[in-house]
Amino acid sequence: MMFRTLDDANVQSKRVLVRVDLNVPMANGEVTDLTRIERIVPTIAELSRKGAKVILLAHFGRPKGVASDENSLKHVVKPLSKVLDHSVHFAEDCIGDKAKAAVDALKDGDVLLLENTRFHKGEEKNDPEFVQALAANGDLYVNDAFSAAHRAHASTEGLAHVLPAFAGRAMQAELEALEKGLGNPARPVVAIVGGAKVSTKLDLLSNLIEKVDALVIGGGMANTFLAAKGLDVGKSLCEHELASTAREIMAKAETTKCAIILPVDAIVGWHFAADTPHQTYGVDSVPGDAMILDAGELSTDLIASAIDDAATLVWNGPLGAFELRPFDTATVKVARHVAKRTKEGKLVSVGGGGDTVAALNHAGVADDFTYISTAGGAFLEWMEGKPLPGVDVLKK
C-alpha cells in the first residue's frame, strides 16, 4: 500500500491540521493512561521542529453534538504539553471565530489544540459545510489517528478531500505493521483469535480463513466450536445456537487449506472466580457441572509448535479467562513464546484489540512484539478485511 507521509510534505510556515487520537481514559479530571498521547509525539514534534503551525483536531467521548465540560479537551492540554515537553495553546472551539483567532496568533513551531470536534453534529455526519469550516484553518492535513480510521467523519476522512493529505508517523507505523501482518505477510501466517464470543468475530473468522495458513481459536469462542463437534462443554460459556455457523467455518477452512487449531485439553473450574478449585481434563471428558476457563498444557504446546513453524503471527483476543489466576496460564505462556521467537528474529508478530493489549501487558511482553495496535475497532475492521475510509483517502 502506497500512501503519502510527512516525507512528502513541505510544512515550513504552513498551518497543518493534524487529526490525533486523544480519546484517553480519565478519572476525576485526570488522564489515567498516557499511551495514546505518547503515540502522537513523534508527528507533533517533527512538524513543530520543521516550522509548521501545528493545529490538533480530536474527539473526546460521545457528546453527540452538544458541548459539555466533561467532554472538553481542555483537560488534556496539561498532560499533552508535559509529554510533548512543549507548550500547547487551546481554543474553545474547533471552527468559527474562536478557532480562527487562535490559529491566526500562531507562530512557526507553535502547537494548538482545538476543542472537541464532536461538539458539532457535522463531525460524525461528515457534513461538507463543517469540513469546509475546519479546512478554513489549514493549508495541509495530516491524519495520525488510525484508531478513528474506520469512521468516515469530517476530521478523519472529509478533510482529506479538500486539503493535501498525509499520514502522520503513528499512522504510518501502524499501516506498515499491518501490511506485514496480513497485507503482504511472510508465510506461513498463524492467527490467534480468542475472547468470549464467536458472534462478535464472525466477519473476522471468515476473512482470516482465506488469508492465513493456521487459525488458533481460543477463549470462550473455542467452546462453541468444541460443542459444534459434538463435545460436551459442561457449564462453559458457549453459544450453542451458533453451532451450525461454527461447522460452516470449519468446512470453509478445509477448502481454503487453513488448519484450525482448537484446544485438546482444558483447565476447568466449578466457579468463575480466581483461585477456584481447578483441574485439567481432555476436551472429550469435561465434567457436566464444570466450566472451561483456560486451555491446558497440551493445547499450549500445540499452539507453540504452530508458532515455531510460522513466519508471521496476528493475535486478537486472550486464550482463557486471563484476568483470573491461574486461568491466565495459556495466554501468558503463548505470549511469552511469541515474544521469544520475535526477539530471535524468527517471527513478525502483530497484536491488537483492547483485551489483547491488556493480556500482553499482563504477560509482560507487549514491548517484545513487532507491533501492538491500540486501535480497537479500526484494528478489528482491518482484520475483517473491511475498507478503512480514513486510510483509503491517504493512498497515493
From Swiss-Prot:
Pathway: Carbohydrate degradation; glycolysis; pyruvate from D-glyceraldehyde 3-phosphate: step 2/5. ATP binds at residues 201, 323, 353-356. It is found in: Cytoplasm. GO terms for cellular component: cytosol. Keywords: ATP-binding, Cytoplasm, Glycolysis, Kinase, Nucleotide-binding, Transferase. The keyword ATP-binding applies. One of its GO terms (biological process) is glycolytic process. Pfam families: PGK (PF00162). HAMAP family: Phosphoglyc_kinase. Monomer. This is Phosphoglycerate kinase. The gene is pgk.
